[in-house]
Amino acid sequence: MQSMPDSTRHPPLSYCKAGVDIEKAADLVEAIKPIAKRTRRPGVLSGIGGFGGLFELPRGYKQPVLVSGTDGVGTKLKLAVELNRHDTIGIDLVAMCVNDVITTGAEPLFFLDYYATGHLNNEQAKQILTGIGAGCELAEVALIGGETAEMPGLYRQKDYDLAGFCVGVVEKEKIIDGSRVRVGDALIGIASSGPHSNGYSLIRKILARAKIPLSQSFENKSLADGLLAPTRIYVKTIKRLFSEINVHALAHITGGGLIENVPRVLPSYTQAVIDSNGWEWPAIFHWLQKQGKVPIEEMWRTFNMGVGMVLCLDKKEIRKTLELLAALGETAWILGEIQSSSEEQPRVTITP
């Protein structure tokens, strides 16, 4: 008969010895509380640390519709880990969620985060969460909850992952779903800050092949600064537009670029015809294409190419919209127009 192993030879085990430090996690929760407090807005009914975040719907809505969105930052996180720079990656996380929610016509209300790592490093975590708080302030949303998961053995020592969750509200009759888009409508692009949070698996492959240090100077700053520039948050700008412009549709340009994202808000039998001469690609995209010998079609299908958000509206509103965007500090231009199409035609045509 097989004997049982002698457990007396080994010291007692604990959760901490298994790799999960509950006290460190509790300290982090305390550090998050002042960050969340800075994002507080009307409607928040609870603080950080409870089992659920409470938020009261704003008054004045006749038929309020809740809009939810969730997203992550992708492999841009790997660059942050390699460079040990975590102060802006939280802004990226918030941006990816709130920019999606605002495209429906909704006002983003509150945000929650999920932070998972193999070994909890509170200094690293505080940088990340401070960035999340900064993003929430920029988007005027409340940080009302989240989850920190320390999972030894699942992630390498310094690696971590992030996910964000946002909820907004819109009056039912004011939902923007593309149904108002008409042939002849104008498309206006609002500038991005760079690649934002998409295409980084290709970017990292290009960097590995080129063997160029991220400390290298690029456009009066380091290449690292250019690639880690946080995703633009368009919420304040778009909310102002809603008050003055009849916006027919909005597309947040993320993974898949203009090619994949603009069709998501177009009715059947329409296509977006985009004039690529309407704007100059930011230098980082020229650099990436050259270093990686990336075909032009792949560039359009992977990156935002300098366009972070696309607006669709009546041509009569072009001048007013561009003037308002300029007054709000945005760089914007006429991107193209909506034309009729057949099922066989592409949903987006980019003219040289």
Swiss-Prot record:
Q: Which pathway, per its entry?
A: Purine metabolism; IMP biosynthesis via de novo pathway; 5-amino-1-(5-phospho-D-ribosyl)imidazole from N(2)-formyl-N(1)-(5-phospho-D-ribosyl)glycinamide: step 2/2
Main enzyme class: ligase
Q: Does the keyword Transmembrane apply?
A: no
**GO biological process annotations for this chain's record?**
'de novo' IMP biosynthetic process; adenine biosynthetic process
User: Which InterPro entries does the annotation name?
Assistant: PurM-like_C_dom (IPR010918), PurM-like_C_sf (IPR036676), PurM-like_N (IPR016188), PurM-like_N_sf (IPR036921), PurM_cligase (IPR004733)
Which SUPFAM superfamilies does this chain map to?
A: PurM C-terminal domain-like (SSF56042), PurM N-terminal domain-like (SSF55326)
A Pfam family annotated for this chain is AIRS_C
Q: Which reaction does it catalyse?
A: 2-formamido-N(1)-(5-O-phospho-beta-D-ribosyl)acetamidine + ATP = 5-amino-1-(5-phospho-beta-D-ribosyl)imidazole + ADP + phosphate + H(+)
Bilayer-spanning residue ranges: none
State any GO CC term.
Answer: cytosol
Q: Which UniProt keywords apply?
A: ATP-binding, Cytoplasm, Ligase, Nucleotide-binding, Purine biosynthesis
Q: Could you name the domain of life of the organism this protein comes from?
A: Bacteria
Query: What does UniProt give as the signal peptide span?
Result: none
The EC number(s) given in the record are 6.3.3.1
Say yes or no: keyword Hydrolase present: no
Q: Which cellular compartments is it found in?
A: Cytoplasm
* MF term (GO), any: ATP binding
Cited NCBIfam families:
purM (TIGR00878)
Family as reported in the entry's similarity comment: Belongs to the AIR synthase family.
Query: What protein name is recorded for this chain?
Result: Phosphoribosylformylglycinamidine cyclo-ligase
Q: Say which species the protein is native to.
A: Coxiella burnetii (strain Dugway 5J108-111)
